[in-house]
Design a protein with these regions (language model features):
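Metal-dependent active-site segment of extracytoplasmic phospho-/sulfohydrolases and closely related
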Residues: 1-38
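Extracytoplasmic/secreted proteins, especially bacterial periplasmic and envelope-associated proteins
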Residues: 3-7, 16, 52, 95, ...
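Short glycine- and hydrophobic/aromatic-rich loop-to-beta-strand nucleating segment
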Residues: 73-75, 91
Length: 239
């Protein structure tokens, strides 16, 4: 990956497009603790451990604790974004589209979830406005639900009956559930989750044969799955 990205950057310089190219580089989910053992309790890759602070984020890919959601996010735009700067702005993937739209002057469709982070990237003085903030961030995945507001995070694991609440400013590892001592905070975050939830609508799911093909490809099988069998119709004949 490093070599191929380097080749892209080098080509941009050769074509004199380097300072006209805004690049986003990110992971898609938290790490997975592959090959766990007594010697490597978090797996050989030490999934979701902050190398600078030593904080071990709870969870992994596929769950909605911090370890499943925190990802690297790097933005590059030579001549526009100052290098070697670290931001603590809270954002997520839907922010990429409006950021690109603002940078290019494109018109955005209505009703999108993201906000532009261009002021955070360029500096508010260069962008000509202050950076807006999300009221909250919301996730749903395989029965899990989570919502974050500031440093508060409420999580409801799959099949759980009760919500959990964590103060990430004091407990980034999410080791102490403080729901019982902060009922009003939890109530507020659950209300946000209820506001954000959209029930599944009939007829909007995708074709299952595509997912079956992807699943088989992960196992090294690149053949086409068998098409679904057609159901026989009952035909009534008159005697």
């Amino acid at each position: 990956v490093d070599r191929q990205i380097g080749e892209i950057f080098q080509l941009g310089e050769e074509l004199k497009l380097d300072e006209k190219t805004l690049v986003f580089f990110s992971g898609d989910n938290g790490g997975a603790d592959y090959f766990v053992s007594d010697d490597h309790p978090r797996g050989i890759h030490q999934a979701n451990k902050n190398p600078k602070t030593g904080v071990e984020y709870r969870g992994k890919k596929g769950v909605l604790y911090e370890g499943g959601l925190r990802i690297p996010f790097v933005v590059r735009w030579p001549g526009k974004i100052a290098p070697n700067r670290v931001s603590d702005h809270l954002g997520y993937f839907p922010d990429v589209l409006p950021t690109i739209a603002e940078a290019t002057g494109a018109k955005l469709p209505s009703g999108i979830d993201g906000i532009s982070i261009l002021p955070e990237l360029l500096g508010e003085s260069s962008a000509g406005r202050k950076q807006s903030q999300h009221e909250f961030l919301y996730w749903e995945f395989t029965g899990w639900t989570a919502v974050r507001h500031g440093n508060w995070r409420a999580v409801k694991p799959a099949k759980a009956t009760n919500w959990e609440l964590y103060d990430l400013a004091k407990d980034p590892s999410e080791s102490q559930d403080v729901a019982s001592s902060n009922p009003r905070v939890l109530e507020s975050l659950v209300a946000m989750a209820t506001k954000a939830h959209e029930p599944v609508q009939e007829g909007t799911f995708t074709r299952t044969d595509r997912h079956e093909r992807d699943r088989r490809a992960k196992m090294g099988k690149h053949d086409e799955p068998e098409p679904p069998k057609k159901q026989k119709k009952n035909v009534q004949t008159k005697s």
